[in-house]
Amino acid sequence: MTDTAARVAVCQAYLDGLVAGDLDAVLSLFADDATVEDPVGTEPKVGREALAAFYQIACDFVTAAQLTGTPRVAGDEVAFPFEITTGTGDKASIISIIDVFRFNEAGKIVSMRAWWGGDNVRPA
């Protein structure tokens, strides 16, 4: 598998892990010292413990996720547009997001930045 194909596969594995509520699967994609800035402009979460706390919430609330366009790979980074559905019933929302992952030489995510804001959230 090429680096490009492997990085695109990580995008799908990330979404699959969120929907499955599989915290271990999501965390396995990240380096131990990775950072997550979600959304961009918030205080980054740094390291395995902070990521576990953040992603536990995501794994508990994401009910669906899908790519909404083709991931773009450049160098050691990939940008990809997707939507997640959170909550159920009349509390369900859809959030349109663009994530950028940066990878280390081992193919682990070392940085994740998520571009989204209030204008990107709508009722499901």
Where does each model-flagged region fall?
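A solvent-exposed, acidic/Ser-Thr-rich amphipathic alpha-helical stretch
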Residues: 23-75
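A beta-strand edge to alpha-helix "cap/lid" segment located at domain peripheries
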Residues: 2-3, 52-124
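Short, low-complexity N-terminal intrinsically disordered segments enriched in polar/charged residues
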Residues: 1-32, 123-124
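A generic structural signal for ordered secondary structure
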Residues: 7-11, 26, 38, 52, ...
